[in-house]
């Protein structure tokens, strides 16, 4: 099975080497958010959708930054985030919930799944230094009964990584505390983003 590292591209991902970002700047940005901003995933989701169903597999080891608890601003409102967003040519502007900081405690893992809400994500790993465990893509259409592993990809820590959410994927148990800034959208398909990349019109 193929394992991709560094600057790479394959069927379900592409490292966007046209974008360079300052990981230390994002680390400092993340570190300003105190414990009151670190909400368990299920609690975070209800801030924006009170009827959001409880997901048992998304334990309290998986938290998201609820930025308004710090000073009333959403993540998307901060200049450091806007500077990143401006580097991409999305089909439509991102919304408030399309910018996320994800924080995972050691021992958390993602079972095989698809992203129900979005088509693509652009991942900026903040911690640990090596970017953490790889993303694994799986064959099949039923995430409850996936087929064979297709390949694994380690997120680049130099350039953001574009991934599709519509292919079954998982992440093995995390050994270290992990933090990722994620831009996501349901209004730009993976193929549209790749086509724009190929024409030099996405970044």
Language-model segments: residues:
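Generic structural signal for short, solvent-exposed loop/turn connectors between secondary structure elements
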Residues: 1, 72-73, 77, 87-98, ...
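Catalytic core of non-heme Fe(II) oxygenases with the double-stranded beta-helix
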Residues: 94-162
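Short beta-strand-to-loop capping motifs
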Residues: 18, 126, 183-187
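Non-heme Fe(II)/2-oxoglutarate
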Residues: 1-93
């Amino acid at each position: 099975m193929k394992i991709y590292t560094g600057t790479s591209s394959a069927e379900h991902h592409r490292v966007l080497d046209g974008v360079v970002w300052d990981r230390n700047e994002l680390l400092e940005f993340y570190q300003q958010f105190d414990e009151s901003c670190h909400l368990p995933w299920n609690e975070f989701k209800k801030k924006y959708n009170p009827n959001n169903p409880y997901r048992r597999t998304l334990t309290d080891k998986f938290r998201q930054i609820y930025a308004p608890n710090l000073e009333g601003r959403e993540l998307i409102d901060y200049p450091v985030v806007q500077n990143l967003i401006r580097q991409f040519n999305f089909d439509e502007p991102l919304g408030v919930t399309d910018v996320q900081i994800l924080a995972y405690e050691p021992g958390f893992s993602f079972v095989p799944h698809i992203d129900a809400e979005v088509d693509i994500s652009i991942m900026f790993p903040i911690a640990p230094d090596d970017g953490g465990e790889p993303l694994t893509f799986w064959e099949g259409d039923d995430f409850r009964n996936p087929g064979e592993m297709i390949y694994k990809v380690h997120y680049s820590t130099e350039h953001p990584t574009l991934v599709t959410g519509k292919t079954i994927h998982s992440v093995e148990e995390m050994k270290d505390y992990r933090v990722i800034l994620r831009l996501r959208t349901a209004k730009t398909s993976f193929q549209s983003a790749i086509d724009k990349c190929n024409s030099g019109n996405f970044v």
